[in-house]
Design a protein with these regions (language model features):
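Intrinsically disordered, low-complexity polar regions and short flexible loop motifs
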Residues: 112
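C-terminal cap/loop subdomain of S1 sulfatases and analogous C-terminal strand-loop tails that border
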Residues: 13, 20, 25-28, 32-109
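Histidine-centered active-site microenvironments of extracellular/periplasmic hydrolases
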Residues: 1-12, 23
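Short, intrinsically disordered, charge-balanced linker/junction segments flanking boundaries
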Residues: 119-121
Length: 121
């Protein structure tokens, strides 16, 4: 869930960084917002615009129609967890549930960036 996103453009300060989590579902609302198009209601898409974060370092919130960032991997893959799972990131925490054995992992991502201490056990 921690994949860098690099954005460059007019009005965006070079070398600036933000630790605010965003997801692929935030890209459409952000692009629409940057283009000045307000026709997509927040309730019509899962993501939210992070345009204000690009121009205002004091802002660190993405307003979404749902609270948290959701991920679902319904198949086995060779990346990361390698098992079908679903995850939600909300605030400082990430909760993962595996489909095969119903096991659960819970991590505080601020205190445990490497996700070593499972708080669900």
């Amino acid at each position: 869930m921690r994949v860098p996103l690099i954005i460059s453009g007019p009005g965006i300060k070079g070398g600036s960084e933000s630790g605010t989590p965003v997801s692929g579902s935030d890209l459409l609302p952000t692009i629409m917002d940057l283009a000045g198009n307000k026709t997509i209601a927040l309730t019509e898409v899962d993501g939210g615009s992070f345009a204000s974060i690009l121009f205002n370092k004091d802002n660190n919130q993405v307003e979404r129609s749902v609270d948290g960032i959701f991920f679902h991997v319904p198949y086995k893959n060779g990346i990361a967890l390698k098992r079908p799972h679903s995850a939600i990131r909300k605030g400082d925490y990430k909760l993962i549930k595996f489909q095969d054995d119903k096991s659960t992992l819970l991590f505080n991502l601020v205190k445990d960036k490497k996700e070593q201490l499972n708080l669900a056990t």
